[in-house]
């Protein structure tokens, strides 16, 4: 049975797409049992949590993965480093006004070269950096924060596009639900919390191009989950608490783990696509930002609470002039 992408469309006023992080954010709380909606300041999240609950967050750290490069003609090309393979080799996505003919040698801002070659993927290319240093150090010198295209920023590095608990470098996008937390809020949480690591890939920005969303293929991302987290969640279930995932990356990590033949710690790749009809295994609640129309992230929310209720929540958020997407306000589903 087909699932029409237009079921996940809604009218989002452009002015509600936040361009910068607010000092104080709002929280829309949706209670699944009674279908009740409230809007509070984000710091009041602690009143909706109990000691038996647990929060699972993503401690990935955004790397400055956007690079400027130039063709021999002088035409500009943007490189987005998806994965660092070795000191001189990476998997990248390219963006330019005209299709890049491969293989291609591009000139970097440092004056050094990078060779771009095709792979079996239509999106991801192989890049060989002919540089004196390693790629990670090169990104620190010349890379920029890979902000989504709808956020206009002149800053090369945006310090606000990083969670307060970011630890392990590798993401090209922040797990933005975590941006609402401060160390002060973490210290006042009434329940335990822990961290998975999923390095958010460029696939998070890719649109669904099929009318039938079931034909969409998610981009692979690697995650790491520990025995400590698995034990925490099992204990939470035993104590009738709720496992609340902070962000869609944490949702996908936990649901993918609980779909394995054995629930064990380790590093895995996942291309799990959560949409209506998905059978949830472990996540009881979600903290997430407000997402764009027709996005896989909004489809995940529709799966969690039903498409009709998701649209109702979003309409109320729009009427309340809550901010959307990366720097926007948050939604707590419990």
Label each PLM-derived region with a short phrase:
Residues 1-334:
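A cross-family signal for N-terminal binding/gating loops and helix N-caps
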